[in-house]
């Protein structure tokens, strides 16, 4: 499983430091529940009774990132996603990269989520996004999907990492320490 490799890498690297890696952090699990809809919207949608709403919300109406990295000294948190997807590489067809794992990460760019990530995580600098995406699998070498992802992230190219097959855990750690750790200080 892809996620387990990343988790293992950071757990080892963070031993004896101020940093902690958490799997599926819960800070955003109930993010949407208390969001107030307008009276106009409420008049046009299904509104179950309080008991039904409470039951439905127990599982959480929010976001569950794959991981977070917390600096226990500063309290700042970087939320993260891991995306594994097939792709167009040698011996395959262009449509072999048609999965949508990379497209699903576009929700991270929603203004409301960015604001929540900044508020909860304490990363307020506009020089960086408050999340990090690590991509794995053939997508990391796919000429079409690499262009899409680079275009989407634009000047925030440090907020994603293509963990390609020829790379090691040291490459992943180097990227984190060089480009993202400073924002957790």
Region locations from a protein language model:
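Short acidic alpha-helical/loop segments enriched in Asp/Glu that coordinate divalent cations
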Residues: 21-23, 92-93
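Non-catalytic C-terminal interaction segments of nucleic acid-processing enzymes
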Residues: 125, 134-185
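Nuclease catalytic cores
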Residues: 1-14
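Catalytic cores of nucleic-acid endonucleases
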Residues: 74-78, 83-149
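Extended interaction regions within the primary functional domain
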Residues: 14, 28-38, 144-155
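Short secondary-structure junctions
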Residues: 14-20
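Ordered hydrophobic segments in well-structured contexts
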Residues: 62, 66-70, 77-80, 130-133, ...
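Active-site metal-binding core of divalent-cation-utilizing nuclease and nuclease-like domains
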Residues: 22-75
